[in-house]
Amino acid sequence: MKIVFLDAATMGDVSFAPIEKLGDFVCYDRSTPQEAIERVKDCEVLIINKVLVTPQLIDAAPSLKLICESATGVNNIDLEYAASKGIPVRNAVGYSTSSVVQATFMQILSLMGEGPYYDSCVKSGRYSSMDIFTDPSVSWRELEGMRIGIIGMGNIGSRVAKIAEAFGMEICYYSTSGTGHCKEYPCLSLEELMKTSDIVSIHAPLNERTNGLIGAAEIALMKPTALLVNMGRGGIVDEKALADAIDNGTIAGAALDVFVTEPLPADNPLLHVRHPERLRLAPHAAWASVQARERLVTQIAANIEKGW
């Protein structure tokens, strides 16, 4: 059985041993559309991450029996055409939950605790020249007693809520699906959540309900001391409106791991704010802990072992 992974560069240095033992495994870091067509000609199992699986690509692989998505979302695959050819598509779910939850609090604590400032204070030598034992020039705040408003109370959002509880925070949420299925915490309107939360944390998928959900009007509802965190998808937040809010002091700060266009274009307004210290940006890496990538490989292997 020949197994081809067309764009494995996003997986980093993880071992593919669980997949390698299943057959003849060929792995490419990246594949252009034309390269992809050449590389799938004799494969039976196709693994992709962001490569577009078009009818043309499927037709170029006459022996293809299974498509494995090395992620949860499958919007890069023509599912209807694959089904018409009798080719099953399997994705991976839940592998990155712990990783994203931890990354969420890494960013929140960095913003709330002024970590970069204090680190610079000591390493730059400023602390060594002080005449008192501490640096009182900046203030940081405790999470205890604050309200966190979670947009999207799925697997990740609910785990964020549990950890927020451990910090002594008050939890509320907005249901992007409109079901309000979680009865453990109050489900608020988006307007009320934005107005009353000290931290707004986004953990929703990108769909017709969430695309452009947080724009200038919604950000303007937030407290001037509030933080906005987006660990969901880039298209949920208007990046220009957020950059303006950071510079104008409409909100205290923001952290983003996802963007409308990835990689982030050099002219993106978030890279040119006047107050970068109020902003934490990460290159869509919240999903990618060592353990999460290992779980992902294990899931892909299990999906192949199921057969077709």
Residue ranges and their predicted role:
Residues 1-43, 172:
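N-terminal glycine-/charge-rich "phosphate-binding" loop or analogous flexible N-terminal tail
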Residues 14, 18, 134-224:
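Rossmann-like dinucleotide/phosphate-binding beta-alpha-beta segment
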Residues 29, 49, 70-71, 87-98, ...:
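Short beta->alpha connector loops at strand-helix junctions that form conserved
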Residues 43, 61, 196-197, 225:
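An anion/phosphate-binding loop that grips the pyrophosphate of nucleotide cofactors and donors
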Residues 51, 72, 198, 204-206, ...:
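Short glycine-/small-residue-rich Rossmann-like dinucleotide-binding loops
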Residues 93-147:
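Phosphate-binding beta-alpha-beta segment of Rossmann-like dinucleotide-binding domains, i.e.
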Residues 225-227, 231-308:
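Rossmann-like dinucleotide-binding domain for NAD(H)/NADP(H)
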